[in-house]
């Protein structure tokens, strides 16, 4: 079995390198290349099926259990992933009208993320790949955010962004400005030196008693606010790092 491992080389850019099990990391096939992708880095269990670069299905199970705690509880998240991963994968394959035997490879989020949550997805993907005798491709989920611009459905009008381009990567746990020169060549130009934008918003929402998740709530209130109410000085620091 071929397992493609990801080595971070520049910024967050991974390159697929083969393990000693095989001297190539390329999927060779005369048939359409069909990949099952599994994501479990935080509190959403997701599975998608891609065929020759076209999205056939995308299924996500969210976890409402964290709302009572005002944030994601890692232990509860990993347990919920264990309950959700089988039905989510089954539904993704069913929606794509793809059998397990049709799969060319399985891709799974290796990190960054919550250790317990990642372990569920990686263990499931590894076991499934071994059982089917197909390659397992480990993926950096931040690169996945950036390359999401290239995902498209069948018959969808699609124009991929030209290289190089600048990407503002904002998620719950990461906020970065990334220069993308190629799908496997990326450079971090600047990033938050403390909390990510999502973390800052959720913390503010919790402190003010607005509930979780805080993003939709604060966004709604911000639209009703006065953007000139507070005057902030312009930052004058070296580099492009910033702080929330």
Name the predicted role of every residue range.
Residues 15-18:
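N-terminal polybasic/positive-inside topogenic patches
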Residues 29-31, 139-165:
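Conserved phosphate-binding catalytic cores of ATP/NTP-utilizing and phosphoryl-transfer enzymes
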Residues 29-33, 41, 58, 161, ...:
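A short helix-loop
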Residues 31-102, 108-112, 141:
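N-terminal beta-alpha supersecondary unit
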Residues 37-38, 107-109, 140, 166-171, ...:
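Short beta-strand segments
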Residues 45-50, 167, 175-179:
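Short beta-strand scaffold segments in enzyme catalytic cores
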Residues 108-132, 151:
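Short Gly/Thr/Asp-enriched flexible loops that form oxyanion-binding sites at enzyme active sites
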Residues 125-146, 194:
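Short, acidic/small-residue loops that bind anionic groups at enzyme active sites
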């Amino acid at each position: 079995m071929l397992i493609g491992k990801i080595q971070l080389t520049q910024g967050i850019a991974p390159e697929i390198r083969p393990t000693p099990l095989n001297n190539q990391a390329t999927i060779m096939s005369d048939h359409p290349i069909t990949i099952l992708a599994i994501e479990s880095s935080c509190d959403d269990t997701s599975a998608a099926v891609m065929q020759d670069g076209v999205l056939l299905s995308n299924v996500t199970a969210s976890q409402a259990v964290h709302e009572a705690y005002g944030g994601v509880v890692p232990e509860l998240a990993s347990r919920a992933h264990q309950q959700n991963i089988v039905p989510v994968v089954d539904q993704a394959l069913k929606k794509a009208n793809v059998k397990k035997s049709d799969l060319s490879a399985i891709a799974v989020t290796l990190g960054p993320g919550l250790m317990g949550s990642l372990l569920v997805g990686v263990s499931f993907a590894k076991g499934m790949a071994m059982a089917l005798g197909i390659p397992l491709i480990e993926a950096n989920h931040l690169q996945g955010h950036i390359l999401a611009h290239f995902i498209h459905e069948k018959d969808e009008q699609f124009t991929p962004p030209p290289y190089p381009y600048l990407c503002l990567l904002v998620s719950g746990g990461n906020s970065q400005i990334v220069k993308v020169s190629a799908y496997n060549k990326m450079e971090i130009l600047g990033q938050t030196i403390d909390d990510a934008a999502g973390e800052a918003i959720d913390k503010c929402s919790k402190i003010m008693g607005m509930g979780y998740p805080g993003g939709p709530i604060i966004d709604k209130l911000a639209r009703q606010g006065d953007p000139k109410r507070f005057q902030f000085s312009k930052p004058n620091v070296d580099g492009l790092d910033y702080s929330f």
